[in-house]
């Protein structure tokens, strides 16, 4: 089995876990922080914009069962790629949309996919999701891991605006 890693930021990490976890070939999805300048950041620090980190998910996958390309395509359907200042009700640089790439192949796939999305005409505004080189990923505190399973009512409430937008946008 050949494993690979993908890191995506798309707003609150709670809402990014379930759609990836449900795919065949996904070995793990970890909520965490990346892109900042503080070692071992905490949720409270990131939430208060003290670290420069972005909430993200780290996905370990079996690339013989699922491709990086298919993960990028799924990622687009989980975000508003026209909003650089957060996602849905979550505002600020710690919620900005980013595809973090580990190598030239991931960068090529992400950039081509972004260009295809822009050319598709699905969005009236430009696609502003960043594509950046991966930095150290710090797993979030345990209570954030698998949040949608541990707290289904809180998860449903916190993700409602996101789900409403995505259903409307991607069912065109």
From Swiss-Prot:
It comes from Lactococcus lactis subsp. lactis (strain IL1403) (Streptococcus lactis). The active site is at 12. It comes from the Bacteria. It holds the Pfam family PMSR. The gene is msrA2. It is an enzyme of class 1 (oxidoreductase). HAMAP family: MsrA. This is Peptide methionine sulfoxide reductase MsrA 2. Keywords: Oxidoreductase. Its EC number is 1.8.4.11. The keyword Oxidoreductase applies. It catalyses: L-methionyl-[protein] + [thioredoxin]-disulfide + H2O = L-methionyl-(S)-S-oxide-[protein] + [thioredoxin]-dithiol; [thioredoxin]-disulfide + L-methionine + H2O = L-methionine (S)-S-oxide + [thioredoxin]-dithiol. Belongs to the MsrA Met sulfoxide reductase family. GO terms for biological process: protein modification process.
């Amino acid at each position: 089995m050949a494993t690979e890693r993908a890191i995506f930021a798309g707003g609150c990490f709670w809402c990014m876990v379930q759609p990836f976890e449900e795919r065949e070939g996904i070995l793990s999805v970890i909520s965490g922080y990346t892109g900042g300048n503080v070692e071992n950041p905490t949720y409270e620090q990131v939430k208060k914009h003290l670290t420069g980190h972005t909430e993200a998910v780290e996905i370990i996958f079996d690339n013989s069962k699922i491709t990086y390309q298919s993960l990028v395509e799924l990622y687009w359907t989980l975000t508003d790629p026209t909003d650089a200042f957060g996602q849905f009700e979550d505002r600020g640089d710690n919620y900005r949309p980013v595809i973090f790439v580990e190598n030239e192949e991931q960068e090529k796939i992400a950039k081509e996919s972004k260009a295809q999305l822009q050319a598709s005409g699905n969005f009236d505004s430009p696609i502003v999701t960043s594509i950046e080189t991966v930095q150290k990923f710090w797993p979030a505190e345990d209570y954030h891991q698998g949040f949608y399973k541990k707290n289904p009512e809180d998860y449903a409430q916190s993700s409602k605006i996101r789900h409403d937008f995505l259903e409307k946008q991607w069912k065109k």
